[in-house]
Amino acid sequence: MVTGKQTELIPIPFPPYQIPYSSKFTDSPAFIYFVAAFSVAGLYSIITSLLSGLALLKPGYAKQLVSHFVVVDVLLLGIVAAAIGAAGGVGYIGLRGNSHSRWTKICNIYDTFCQHLAGSIAAGLIASIVLVLLILLSFFTLSRKIPK
């Protein structure tokens, strides 16, 4: 998403000139939110990896860490899902436009930018599915440690 930037010559009707206009992810708050949400999720995954490694050295803290990880993982899943939805909505308007609001599609002009956008959203969807699977794994691990 961050590397998606494209400059094209856009024709203006009067007089018949073309002006360069660039499109980048900072043009949309939804794209900025997408980058910020996945940056936070990436930083959190690094921190949890380090803490999980430390928990292997001191097994007494493992139950507490897993329970905290499950809660924060679910919160991050909500943030990541909202970011994917916001970026996907703006991307869809860029792809198809909106005739009711008279927003024209831009992906026929900024094709490389839209390809970067689509790739980022697809990678984000895959990452969110992996996050759901990891949350389920953490939940089942935690439920096995609860005495019956």
Swiss-Prot record:
Subcellular location(s) per record: Cell membrane
Signal peptide: none
GO cellular component: plasma membrane
InterPro entries recorded: CASP/CASPL, CASP_dom, CASPL
TM segment ranges: 31-51, 74-94, 121-141
Disulfide-bonded cysteines: none
Main location, first listed in the record: membrane
Pfam families linked to this entry: CASP_dom
Record's keyword terms, sorted: Cell membrane, Membrane, Transmembrane, Transmembrane helix
Keyword Cell membrane carried by entry: yes
Membrane topology, from the record: Multi-pass membrane protein
Similarity annotation: Belongs to the Casparian strip membrane proteins (CASP) family.
Subunit-level organization: Homodimer and heterodimers.
Protein name in UniProt: CASP-like protein 1
Organism this protein belongs to: Panax ginseng
Biological classification of the source: Eukaryota, Viridiplantae, Streptophyta, Embryophyta, Tracheophyta
